[in-house]
């Protein structure tokens, strides 16, 4: 603990300032330090502001296109994950049939997913968007159409 009396105050203050500023300057000016991060954040904010202005300057259908792209990305991700799960279920089911033990039964109706996707895209293209949430459930309403994603799969594990 430093002794701050009238004889040692100046020397302790001098050495502590010299020590702190000696390490503060290299840390902040190397590009990865505090000043580098602030430059990166300023550039990011400028890019985001220009990007937002460009989106709003386009025609009103651009928001429709953004929603459509987002929905198609989400649907493709969902179907790819369902495909991987169905492949895993088939592999485990074959393994279970060899050992005469059924490990997983009835994962869900995945085969009709592409037909559902076409119907959903058709209904979306003819309707307007409004979204509401109630107690954590996401419900998407499109005029007279209400879509709620419900997982169909039920798994049973037998030991």
Swiss-Prot record:
Give the record's keywords alphabetically.
Answer: ATP synthesis, ATP-binding, CF(0), Hydrogen ion transport, Ion transport, Membrane, Mitochondrion, Nucleotide-binding, Translocase, Transmembrane, Transmembrane helix, Transport
Chief location: mitochondrion
Q: Where are the transmembrane segments?
A: 13-37
From the UniProt record, list the reaction(s) this protein catalyses: ATP + H2O + 4 H(+)(in) = ADP + phosphate + 5 H(+)(out)
Q: Which domain of life is it from?
A: Eukaryota
What membrane topology was assigned to this protein in its record? Single-pass membrane protein
Localization (cell) = Mitochondrion membrane
**Which is an annotated Pfam family here?**
YMF19_C
Assembly, in brief, is: F-type ATPases have 2 components, CF(1) - the catalytic core - and CF(0) - the membrane proton channel. CF(1) has five subunits: alpha(3), beta(3), gamma(1), delta(1), epsilon(1). CF(0) has three main subunits: a, b and c.
Quote the function comment for this protein.
This is one of the chains of the nonenzymatic component (CF(0) subunit) of the mitochondrial ATPase complex.
Q: What is this protein called?
A: Putative ATP synthase protein YMF19
The species is Oenothera berteroana
Gene that this polypeptide is encoded by: YMF19
């Amino acid at each position: 603990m430093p002794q701050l009396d009238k004889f040692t105050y100046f020397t302790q203050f001098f050495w502590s300032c010299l020590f702190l500023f000696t390490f503060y300057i290299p840390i902040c000016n190397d590009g990865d330090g505090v000043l580098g991060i602030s430059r990166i954040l300023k550039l990011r904010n400028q890019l985001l502001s220009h990007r937002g202005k460009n989106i709003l300057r386009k025609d009103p259908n651009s928001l429709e296109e953004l929603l459509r792209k987002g929905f198609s990305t989400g649907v493709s991700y969902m179907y790819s994950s369902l495909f991987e799960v169905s492949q895993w279920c088939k592999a485990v089911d074959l393994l279970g049939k060899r050992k005469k033990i059924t490990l997983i039964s009835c994962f869900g109706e995945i085969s009709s997913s592409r037909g559902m996707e076409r119907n959903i895209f058709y209904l979306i293209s003819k309707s307007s968007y409004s979204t509401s949430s109630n107690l954590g459930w996401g419900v998407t309403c499109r005029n007279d159409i209400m879509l709620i994603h419900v997982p169909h799969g039920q798994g049973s594990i037998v030991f």
